[in-house]
């Protein structure tokens, strides 16, 4: 799936299985009349196939507020089911016409089950204080449970993971927070946010406790265990070049031009320490999209960065996880959801449990591979693996005494 500017906002290509693709955009029935930014895929109605959500930044929601949530009909076609949720809008004015409208500023959607009821909820990161928590009401509709806790002013990217290993999913939002900009009178420059899940989808703002507020002009972000110690670390790419021709505005934006990426290493006590320069994760280009995965399959997580106006960057992790072990798990799902998106993978190591939920389209303008990479430290085996497959059928796969340092593929029980 690709999105772009111009009259054709969307293109969808089917993989033919032989290295070629076929354009099936028209057959899907998805006809966007406004530009789309990030895309998320998830089975929100738990009927076995993957549905889609499109974020539409800086678009007029007055005339046509739909085109967000597309329900898969099981035959490669989709219908617009956006009436089941309400997207927050902000009153704005088109400068060229002085026309006022209700503007949408959503940027990064993520399907994730934050209240542990198996139904994927929707975490929607938005600019200008428009981020939302939309709780899935058993596949019927979504209930807006956004509270004052969600205080990010300029949400751009997002990442979701269980960073404190307590069995539920937490939410990080990248935003704007340069030390110089914080001295300016701009309310939007208040930094990142980390929302810690206290259970059943009840969040608290743990940003200051965790020490992750500062990340310049943040975009793509990802949770990944870069040192294989069993705790999810956090990587964020930054940078912005002002587009305004007004000198006063452009001068403000130039402070973000060469902002470095930040690597927050999880200390295992609900706090993080920024160590990007120390560990060689140095990146000062205009980062946007980000994928964190083991691209060279050597047992540790690397970074692939899509840059604005420049070639991509690969940061290869060669030493940070040295001596620490891992277990990488991919799932083979059923035909309509072959990667088992929405499944939960649990492992137990020395009586400690860790969990990763498989997500698709979970980064700003990008996505990680659909796999679960666990660092297990110095452990010599994984005591148990438990797969909770997506859906309401209650399918479970369990394994014991699993060998470390391997890439494991686990098929669905019905395969």
Each model region followed by its residue ranges:
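Beta-rich catalytic cores
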Residues: 8, 35-40, 65, 105, ...
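Blade-edge motifs of beta-propeller repeat domains
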Residues: 13-34, 70-104, 135-153, 184, ...
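Beta-propeller blade termini
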Residues: 14, 27, 35-46, 105-116, ...
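Solenoidal tandem-repeat scaffolds enriched in leucines and small polar residues
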Residues: 31-132, 153
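Acidic carboxylate motifs that coordinate Ca2+ or other divalent cations, activating on Asp/Glu
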Residues: 47, 51, 117, 121, ...
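Gly/Ser/Thr/Pro-enriched helix-cap/hinge segments flanking short amphipathic alpha-helices
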Residues: 271-415
């Amino acid at each position: 799936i690709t999105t772009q500017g111009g009259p054709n906002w969307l293109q969808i290509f089917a993989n033919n299985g032989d290295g070629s693709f076929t354009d099936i955009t028209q057959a899907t029935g998805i006809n966007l009349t406004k530009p789309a930014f990030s895309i998320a895929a998830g089975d929100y109605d738990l009927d076995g196939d993957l549905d889609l959500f499109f974020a539409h930044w800086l678009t007029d929601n007055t005339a046509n507020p739909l085109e967000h949530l597309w329900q898969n009909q099981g035959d490669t076609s989709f219908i617009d089911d956006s009436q089941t949720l309400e997207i927050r809008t902000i009153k704005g004015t088109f400068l060229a016409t002085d026309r006022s409208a209700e503007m949408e500023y959503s940027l990064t959607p993520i399907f994730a089950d934050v209240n542990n009821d198996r139904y994927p909820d929707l975490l929607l990161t938005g600019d200008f204080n428009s981020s939302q928590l939309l709780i899935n009401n058993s596949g019927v509709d979504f209930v807006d449970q956004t509270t004052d806790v969600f205080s990010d002013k300029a949400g751009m990217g997002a990442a979701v993971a269980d960073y404190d290993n307590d069995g539920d999913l937490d939410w990080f939002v990248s935003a704007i927070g340069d030390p110089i900009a914080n001295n300016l009178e701009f309310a939007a420059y208040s930094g990142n946010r980390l929302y810690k899940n206290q259970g059943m989808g009840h969040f608290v703002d743990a940003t200051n406790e965790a020490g992750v507020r500062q990340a310049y002009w943040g975009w793509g972000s990802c949770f990944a265990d870069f040192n294989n110690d069993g705790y999810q670390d956090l990587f964020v790419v930054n940078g912005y070049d002002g587009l305004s021709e007004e000198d006063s505005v452009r001068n403000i934006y130039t402070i973000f031009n060469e902002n470095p990426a930040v690597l927050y290493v999880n200390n295992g006590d609900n706090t993080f320490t920024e160590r990007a320069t120390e560990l060689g994760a140095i990146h000062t280009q205009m980062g946007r999209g980000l994928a964190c995965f083991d691209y060279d399959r050597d047992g540790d997580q690397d970074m692939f960065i899509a840059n604005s106006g420049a070639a991509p960057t690969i940061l290869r992790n060669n030493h940070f996880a040295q001596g620490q072990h891992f277990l990488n798990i991919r799932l083979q799902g059923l035909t309509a959801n072959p990667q088992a998106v929405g499944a939960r993978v649990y492992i137990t190591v020395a009586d400690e449990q860790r969990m990763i939920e498989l997500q698709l389209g979970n980064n700003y303008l990008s996505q990680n591979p659909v796999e679960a990479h666990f660092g297990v430290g110095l452990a010599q085996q994984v005591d148990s693996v438990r797969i909770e497959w997506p859906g309401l059928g209650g399918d479970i796969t369990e394994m014991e005494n699993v060998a470390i340092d391997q890439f494991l593929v686990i098929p669905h029980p019905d395969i």
